[in-house]
Amino acid sequence: MLSIPSPQVLLALFSMTDLDDSTCKKYIKMITNIVILSLIICISLAFWIMSMTASTYYGSLRPVSPWRWLFSVVVSVVISCNGFKKKSLDHSGALGGLVVGFILTIANFSFFTSLLMFFLTSSKLTKWRGEMKKRLDSEYKEGGQRNWVQVFCNGGVPTELALLYMIENGPGEMPIDFAKQHTASWMCLSLLAALASSAGDTWASEVAPVLSKSSPRLITTWEKVPVGTNGGVTAVGLVSSLLGGTFVGLAYFLTQLVFVNDLDISAPQWPLIAFGGLAGLLGSIVDSFLGATMQFSGLDESTGLVVSSPTQETKHISGKPILDNNAVNLFSSVLVALLLPTAASGFWPTV
């Protein structure tokens, strides 16, 4: 005759077999990470197989190492997910960052470290003294929360240059040497200039409103303007832009020392640091000039904050409503990326 277990026995069995919510979440997270890692490995192997097939078919193409594929995919996923988790990127920004990060990493590790330096420092500075910035900026977002448009305007030019670099030179690191590889060296400096320009502008925008003791001056007329005015510059902002670009150039230079083998028979690489600083400063100046002339700035008399959209309640300060902030960033990045490497090629030291 079968006996029915008592309620106490059933409860004990249930408590032994049933996991609490926190344990379940840990197991689910662990399984999810395993699945994601497995997918990443499969994707990396698939890319490697395609590169090997293309190399065999065309003959002139150099196959990419499977470890390079794996590193490029893993790092891009980790950084994008981390940026989204910390609110530096929104959903679309994380997807855009994934594409930009992957292309720059697979092309050249020096590109990757420069991008990483720009992203990490800019994200930290955006969050720095956020409460104070919220009182000064009408469009302030916690953590930055950059979308795909902002990612494209800051990373679109470097991404296109990285693709052209791979077509010209193939994936891999190389010394900057205009005498031996003029076109590829120009592309590398152009990409560095674009990233350093964006970093310089971001550093100036995030540091100057907090640390500057004096009112900004409009770059076109040198008149004093309220904090947050497009085209307003300060000494603190200009120094910050120089430092921002220098940090990006330093990241590129250090990566060259680690991954490039024939530096002893190539042109000196130390000018990369000065080049990055100059690109950051020039990018900030060009951005300020475009902002002062082609971007509307007005004072909202109801809030006392500077706004970028003309309304009946705003008092015009400077500029015309032709471009928005994203377009200004894109145009300044393009101009610096085109002009500065051409000028640098004439002064770059030789062996």
From Swiss-Prot:
GO CC: one term?
membrane
Entry-linked InterPro entries: DUF92_TMEM19
**TM region(s), chain numbering:** 30-50, 64-84, 99-119, 233-253, 272-292, 328-348
Name recorded for this polypeptide? Transmembrane protein 19
Q: Which PANTHER family does the entry link to?
A: TRANSMEMBRANE PROTEIN 19 (PTHR13353:SF5)
Q: Where in the cell is it found?
A: Membrane
Q: Name one Pfam family in it.
A: DUF92
Q: Which family is it part of?
A: Belongs to the TMEM19 family.
Q: Which gene encodes it?
A: Tmem19
The species is Rattus norvegicus
Q: Name where it mostly resides.
A: membrane
Task: Write down the superkingdom of origin.
Answer: Eukaryota
Q: Which UniProt keywords apply?
A: Membrane, Transmembrane, Transmembrane helix
Tell me how this protein sits in the membrane.
Multi-pass membrane protein
